[in-house]
């Protein structure tokens, strides 16, 4: 089966797995100083699904793996490292993005109206655009995925990265994310996995 013919099945399998991961991690509870937790795989589902449907292909040369969503990237667009302007203008993905409940007042979800820039997303996708020209050329060789779909925030609005969670929170979270990653690798069968971010 060609890559083009297998792509719809690959996208469907990744979509199912991302939905399962979202259900698993959304059932978890996190103690202070974590005050807010959001999951763009839930409230930005349509754009997350559009990303997978359009770009996920089997047997990429590399799976580029980020840790978790940034506040002005995937948290706004549902796309890993989802710098708004690049997702909209280069990838051609745009749509209505919902909002988590509750939403941190200092970290509103504005979706594609967000004017802030995700530095890591600008770097990653800027490199991809410069190196490959078109998203189609990039995604023939690469797939980008985030290990953990959750954004963690303290009451102040400060972002907490997953490794700063308490051990009894981290362990079940990492187990769910590890299980999902193993399945994602099995679905994609990439030549290599590269951590980015």
PLM regions: where:
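A polyanion-binding, active-site-adjacent surface
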Residues: 8-192
